[in-house]
A protein has these predicted regions:
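Tubulin/FtsZ superfamily GTPase core signature
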Residues: 1-391
Length: 391
């Protein structure tokens, strides 16, 4: 079939043999799979970072987009359906294309793979429709399966936002943990970002989330956190978040933690409502001011402020380039989430809010109110009014 020929042209993904690129570990226990345009761009960005223990794969219905990727391992989805022309922003077409390529996708989940990241931008056709199919196949194969997805900027239209939230809800059914990055929060982080750069920044943010978790596993720690700690934190955990922050000078450990927790990317979550918390501190052993035992008390002060229901594990990695700075990466999981109306278990987008926010949600009196609640919970009060003004 022509689909097989195209796969061979892009890469011999049908057998998933190692490529000639020797930058990565021979036994890669982590696979990072980018689905669709946004997911593919994020994985292409990660591929250039040379993270050990990781292999990368990009999947798309768009042959031309795949051709621009540096990642050697590629699968074109559903060629017989779209002839490589993309899903046309139709998630149903994206789903059908993934289902038509199930045999190729299954071959990605070999015996050496222990953890799979699936990255996608929600709201379009391929990412929204195909990513949940890929996630289900990974989970069914026994992989620790993590979804990392973005939802659109506010200016991208109400319909695209609702499509994205539907896709995220579908994705959540088939992963151990789902990290949702709201692109609109990037406008707080980068208030002067140009329209031409905002989508690139969204792809970078998607990549950084997957990279941060991968680095927890791959970087050697002298107070250890490892793959099993990540697995314990994320296995069947529902919704998760990841953030990082840096500190320097006096109270640098506390500053790093505070900066991580102040990230707009954590906007909808209170760390105290999580069930598991994994923290990795990165600092230089050989520097002018190496971390002291006294500074570790700053970690204890923070962890002691959390409810006893939050299970905490932390470690320290020696990263020479940090010099006198300290960086913390925080991975938290097990947040209580609610469907958009708080009760209905039927079809519809999910909102990703902490238990505190969930208690404030009310069942809508009409379907349109349900949609409005989904958007307002995810994007903030007043969003619908602002979107109406922008029309």
């Amino acid at each position: 079939m022509e689909n097989d020929i195209l796969n061979e042209e892009l890469n011999d993904t049908a057998t998933f043999t190692p490529t000639d690129d020797e930058r990565f570990a021979e036994k890669a226990i982590i696979k990072v799979i980018g689905v669709g345009g946004g997911g593919g761009n994020a994985v292409n960005y990660m591929y250039k970072q040379q993270i050990p223990l990781v292999r990368y794969v990009v999947l798309n219905t768009d042959k031309q987009a795949l051709g621009t990727m540096d990642v050697p391992d590629k699968i074109i989805l559903g060629y017989d359906i779209t002839q490589g022309q993309g899903a046309g922003n139709n998630p149903e077409v994206g789903r059908q294309c993934a289902e038509a390529s199930v045999d190729d996708i299954k071959k990605l989940f070999d015996k050496d793979t222990e953890m799979v990241f699936i990255t996608a931008g929600m709201g379009g056709g391929t990412g929204t429709g195909a990513a949940p199919v890929v996630a289900k196949l990974a989970k069914d194969a026994g992989m620790l399966t993590i979804g990392i997805v973005t939802v659109p900027f506010q200016f991208e239209s109400e319909q695209k936002i609702l499509t994205a939230l539907d896709g995220a809800k579908e994705m959540q059914q088939y992963v151990d943990a789902l990290l949702v990055i709201n692109n609109e929060n990037l406008t707080t982080l980068y208030p002067d970002i140009s329209l031409f750069n905002c989508f690139e920044k969204a792809d970078d943010t998607l990549a950084n989330a997957a990279r941060s978790i991968s680095e927890i596993i791959s970087e050697k720690c002298f107070i250890n956190v490892d793959f099993q700690d990540v697995k314990t934190t994320l296995k069947d955990s529902g919704t998760a978040i990841i953030s990082s922050g840096e500190g320097e000078g006096e109270n640098r450990v506390t500053k790093a933690i505070e900066n991580a927790l102040k990230s707009p990317l954590l906007k909808a979550h209170d760390i105290k409502t999580s069930k598991r918390l994994l923290m990795k501190f990165s600092c230089a052993r050989e520097c002018e001011n190496p971390i002291t035992a006294k500074e570790l008390n700053e970690i204890t002060v923070f962890t002691s402020s959390l409810p006893k229901t939050v299970k905490v594990k932390w470690g320290i990695a020696d990263i020479p380039e940090m010099e006198d700075r300290i960086k913390v990466t925080i991975l938290a999981s097990g947040f209580d989430v609610t469907l958009r109306d708080g009760e209905d278990k039927g079809d519809g987008p999910i909102t990703f809010s902490s238990e505190d926010n969930a208690q404030k949600s009310k069942k809508p009196e009409k379907p349109d109110t349900d949609k409005e609640a989904a958007i307002e919970t995810t994007y903030g009060t007043g969003t619908m009014k602002q979107m109406a003004l922008n029309r």
